[in-house]
């Protein structure tokens, strides 16, 4: 990750595709407390990665069905199957997006109407999912969801 990424710096060099504040040719001081930064989100994502064995490798990524082309939905499972993480990302930075989606119950050997537990790893909320067909809403203020799914 480049320095400044967590500050959401995105001003382009006029007439080019590179960032104006890239450290490519300079080292510059930055105000890491500036409004609009995503430092807390990056720190939380790193904690989630460390705490979940499914995220300890780049291998095993699977794409799943979400019936909205503006939502990317995928998951990873630990090698022993004990840790299952699902991620959904809103690709539209300006609008909330909603979709029905499938929980991949078949990967856990469960019937389509099985009961599973979900946990939002960004905010700690927990709930019970019933069946494989579910619904999600992702908005620009929190454009992604990271969920741990368990059977007990």
Where on the chain are the PLM-derived regions?
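Carbohydrate-interacting/catalytic domains
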Residues: 1, 5-152
């Amino acid at each position: 990750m480049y320095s400044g990424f967590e500050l959401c710096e995105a001003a382009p060099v006029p007439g080019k595709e590179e960032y104006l504040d890239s450290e490519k040719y300079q080292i510059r001081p930055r105000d890491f407390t500036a409004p609009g930064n995503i430092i807390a989100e990056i720190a939380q994502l790193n904690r989630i990665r460390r705490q979940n064995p499914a995220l300890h490798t780049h291998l095993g990524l699977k794409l799943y069905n979400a019936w909205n082309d503006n939502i990317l939905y995928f998951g990873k499972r630990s090698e022993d199957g004990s840790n299952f993480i699902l991620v959904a990302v809103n690709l539209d930075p300006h609008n909330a997006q909603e979709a029905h989606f499938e929980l991949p119950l078949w990967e856990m050997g469960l019937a389509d109407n099985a009961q599973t537990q979900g946990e939002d790893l960004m905010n700690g909320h927990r709930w019970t999912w019933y069946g494989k067909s579910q619904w999600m809403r992702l908005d620009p203020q929190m454009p992604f969801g990271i969920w741990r799914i368990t059977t007990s």
